[in-house]
Amino acid sequence: MKAIILAGGQSERFGAPKAFAEIDGKMFYEQIITVLDSMNMFNEIIISSNETLASEFKGARVIVDDSEHKNKGPLSGIYSVMKQDFESELFFVISVDTPLITAKAISQLYQFMVEHVIEDQLDIAGFKEGNHPIPTIAFYSPNCLPIIARALESDDYSMRHVYQQTASDWIDVSSVDDDTEWYKNINYPQDLESIKK
């Protein structure tokens, strides 16, 4: 099983590449790698990024977004990694701007996926907050690849386009016994300041 850290976004709202912002003395991407490594669940951690940032990452293989699908958001990153590593039975996808992710949350989601993958033939298992799925903290089956490819060929690069056309299910973030906001995206500098307090 492989983990994909999505780190190719433009970070326009944040004002600088979020992957290299720091929390507790570690860059966001390093923080996520530390959590993923600690779990001994993943045989490889892959960073999906763009050509400009690719050489800046250390500690994991970097796959640059497929040239024909550059600048098409998270789907482009997932597609580019899946296309190269199609033999993996499952991919855990995490956005780099979610540096508070915990091993407990990932383990709970994995158990949910395993319990439902055969009976319900799940392709995507992820978290949701209320009625809002969080497709950038989710497990993806390689079965999603053709659907992602079709989405990238269309004019709709939204994650919703994919999870509405696959067998997907979501567990609420509140089901994880953790009082931190481990699932929160850091979109603005003030978001980072608020979690440092």
UniProtKB/Swiss-Prot annotation:
Localization of this protein: Cytoplasm
Entry GO CC: cytoplasm
A GO BP annotation: Mo-molybdopterin cofactor biosynthetic process
PANTHER family assigned to the protein according to its UniProt record, in alphabetical order: MOLYBDENUM COFACTOR GUANYLYLTRANSFERASE
Gene Ontology MF terms in the entry: GTP binding; metal ion binding; molybdenum cofactor guanylyltransferase activity
Catalyzed reaction equations: Mo-molybdopterin + GTP + H(+) = Mo-molybdopterin guanine dinucleotide + diphosphate
Keyword field: Cytoplasm, GTP-binding, Magnesium, Metal-binding, Molybdenum cofactor biosynthesis, Nucleotide-binding, Transferase
Residues reported in the UniProt entry to bind GTP: L6, A7, G8, K18, D65, D97
Residues at which Mg(2+) binds: D97
Disulfide bonds: none
EC number: 2.7.7.77
Cofactor annotation: Mg(2+)
Major subcellular location class: cytoplasm
Name of this protein: Probable molybdenum cofactor guanylyltransferase
Top-level EC class as recorded in UniProt: transferase
Top-rank lineage group of the source organism: Bacteria
Coiled-coil regions, chain positions: none
